[in-house]
Amino acid sequence: MKKHLLLVASGLLLSFGASAQTTSADDPLPGYTQAERFAGNKLSTMLFSTSVDPHWFKAGNCFWYEYKTGNGNVWYVVDPSAKTKRPLFDQDKLAAELTEIVKDPYTAQQLPIQKLETGEDGRTFTFQITSSQDAKKDSTDKDKKTKKEVFYFSYDYPTRKLTYLADKKKDTEYPNWASISPDGKTVVYAKDLNLYRMSREDYEKLKKDDKDSTVTEIQLTTTGVKDFGFGQPYSLLNTDTLCNGKRKNPGYLLWSPDSRHFVISISDNRKVKDLWVINAMATPRPTLETYKYQMPGEKEAPVSHLYLFDMSNDSYKEINTQAFKDQTIRMAYRPRLHKQRDMKELPSIWLGDNNRFFVTRSSRDLHRIDVCTYTIGEDSIRPIIEERMNTYIELRPLAAVNNGKELIHWSERDGWAHLYLYDDKGNLKNRITSGPWHVDQIVKVDEAKRVVYFLANGREKGENPYYEHLYRANLDGSGLQMVSAGDYFHDVRVDDNAQFIVHNYSRINTVPKSDLLDNTGRKVMELEESDFSQLFAAGYQFPEPFKVKAADGVTDLYGVMYKPFNFDSTAVLSYLQQSY
């Protein structure tokens, strides 16, 4: 099922109360005046948080979140096991303490807390406050622009004790050019179209001074050339500088879990013709940017190459991947955990174990896709799952079970998107899901209980088929169960232990709400309901969802109707139709 949505808008694309005036000679454009009340800059003062975005603690299943209403921002800590939600701060007390230290006046409703993070112990938080006063010049700061003074704090949640970190300096920022190995000992990066490595010690030196002459760089490759080099990301902005290797970048590689190897895919674009764009963001004037792009019908296509590097001796070799003309190679990666979201310098790790990883190989027309495996020591990748269709084939990320001994594969092979369980040899063990409905994506795999959680739509009768729900099923195909029930669109966050779920849900004509669920869908506690009070006070009314038949008289089309401000149900109105 393709996610196409018909949007019908009658007149102006905002809806509010019947108090709108009718057109008159004295006021020829009342609709525009009324519409201005709902312009983007005005909405930000009437519409606040609409979902809960959890920051899970590094240990356990507690999380914190920030939520804004018409009364300001509040921070909460939730303990799902204890079914409690408590304010993180005594905000009146905190405002007074911050005012005394920073010397800027603060209120409980307006605390400018930045970069709030929790420590490993689950009780200590750190954050910073930017003062209204200019900071003192630092001779080590490369940026000579005037900056505001920043104050750093730690906060002990159980005791509500605030500590001013007077001696703390600005955190050394994580360079975006570094790809750090999982063991943290090696840093690999691309520069001048080739790959280099350095030790963690030298990397730390460069974080403090990027011109430190004592740093030792070891060059791993020498074959990189223009339009066929290592670390050439696709970009529409600053393409001449970025895509031709004049900046350091992380190389877009994936490490083995034991840090002994990494794999990288690069593209040979030398025969592909140039395309040009205007970089309107350049200063002081727009610039002409050039990059490689294959237009429809052109024979010259990018050619993908896959290389494996051995860090024990700094050697590398190309892996044979060839099967389709003008094919594309994509490397499968290990998903990151929710508890890692605020962590810096995270490695990118391949999907698999220390000696094996997975890639997908796609034909140019996307009618043929292979899921392939590669084992270190071999010369070629080996296809284990083949997808063939006469039409465009979509892809979703693989999910690995037990380091890749089993794979959960997403496929539309029977006309509907479903999940299939394979062993690592490519033998189908069983279907996990089936039927006339659409699995959209895997959310979480609980390997211990052999349960997969996934988003799907179109299964519940009488609902808009575009509304996604969270489901769970056993890997053997049994036990299918809807977890997030209700005639809404559901946005979920499943914790790393697959025990609790933050559940945000709404429709176009309802106020968004957020609950905490257990992994079976039972409500543990209510979290939030969005504050629409100021929006309603300004005259806002919800648009109306509707369903009509398509021209074939069979297909249902779902849309949303926004009525004009001075809506007259007896009048014949024109409408705007947007289809994607």
Label every PLM stretch briefly.
Residues 7, 20-512, 516-517, 533-541, ...:
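Beta-propeller folds
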Residues 8-15:
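Bacterial N-terminal signal peptides
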Residues 1-6:
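Bacterial N-terminal signal peptides that target proteins for export
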Residues 527-570:
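N-terminal cap/lid segment of alpha/beta-hydrolase-fold proteins
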Residues 576-579:
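Structural cue for short, hydrophobic secondary-structure segments
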